Amino acid sequence: MIDNCILDEQIFDHYVYQKEYLLLAVPKSYSVNTRLQEYQIPIETIHDGSFLSPEVLSVPLNSFANEPFIILRSDNDTGKRALTICQENNFTPHTIFRLDQQMTAYNIACSGMGITFIGDLLLASAPATSELIFYKLPGKNCNRNVSFYWKKGRYISRAMEEFLKIALPQ
């Protein structure tokens, strides 16, 4: 199994696959974007990872305090982190949708209905859009590990060993 949350180490073994960084995806039609142009990051910098440079500024998140948000459910790691990040930036998001999946939130944001939090790994494989503007988020809660998990004590097949050798960075 692959997941972006921490599972019980008493039950599961894991290998870290890679880091994922959450970003803010804002419909381009929102007027708040005009005041925050210096913080906007092109999708190309997300794809190549250069947005992680310290020179790329994190957006003052409370600038979006009065905007509608699409937030994942609180039992979802992305949903928990989104609420924590907003709390750390001194506001509670005006939530118009509570969803289960990042891809659904992304598609609704593309339609212009609200702002959402999205992982850079998903953006790497999502259909390209010109309907969203992306922003780097402040704080430590915007990054997490994505890991391969399996139950402790279970047999690891030769095929699984070879897959992990290929998939995991050396």
Question: Where in this protein do the model-derived segments appear?
Answer:
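Conserved beta-strand segments of alpha/beta enzyme cores
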Residues: 13, 68, 92-95, 133
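Short beta-strand-centered segments that line the small-molecule binding cleft or hinge
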Residues: 1-43, 133-135
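Secondary-structure junction motif
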Residues: 32-33, 39-89, 156-158
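Hydrophobic hinge/microswitch elements
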Residues: 74-130
